[in-house]
Structure formats: C-alpha cells, structure tokens
Amino acid sequence: MIEPLLLGIVLGLIPVTLAGLFVAAYLQYKRGNDLGME
C-alpha cells in the first residue's frame, strides 16, 4: 500500500517539474530569438 503522503508528494511534484521544464525551454527559446539565433 502506497502511503498517502508519498503519493501526494509525487502528484504535487510532477506538474511542478513539467512546469519548470516548460518555463526553462520557453526562456531559452525566447533568449535565442533575442540574440538572433535560429
């Protein structure tokens, strides 16, 4: 049986991790465009 606390932590971290990766990729893409790099 999975502990509810552990399950809550995992379910909480997944969207945060995905959001962090998305923001990092967006900032890198935007910075690349600002520098004129394709």
Swiss-Prot record:
GO molecular function, one term: electron transporter, transferring electrons within cytochrome b6/f complex of photosystem II activity
Bilayer-crossing regions: 5-25
Keyword Transmembrane helix: yes
UniProt subcellular location: Cellular thylakoid membrane
Keyword set includes Nucleotide-binding: no
Pfam family, one: PetG
Matches recorded under SUPFAM superfamilies: PetG subunit of the cytochrome b6f complex
Keywords: Electron transport, Membrane, Photosynthesis, Thylakoid, Transmembrane, Transmembrane helix, Transport
InterPro entries (alphabetical): Cyt_6/f_cplx_su5, Cyt_6/f_cplx_su5_sf
Primary localisation category: membrane
Family membership noted in the UniProt record: Belongs to the PetG family.
Subunit structure, as described in the record: The 4 large subunits of the cytochrome b6-f complex are cytochrome b6, subunit IV (17 kDa polypeptide, PetD), cytochrome f and the Rieske protein, while the 4 small subunits are PetG, PetL, PetM and PetN. The complex functions as a dimer.
Functional summary from the UniProt entry: Component of the cytochrome b6-f complex, which mediates electron transfer between photosystem II (PSII) and photosystem I (PSI), cyclic electron flow around PSI, and state transitions. PetG is required for either the stability or assembly of the cytochrome b6-f complex.
Protein name, per record: Cytochrome b6-f complex subunit 5
Source species of the chain: Picosynechococcus sp. (strain ATCC 27264 / PCC 7002 / PR-6) (Agmenellum quadruplicatum)
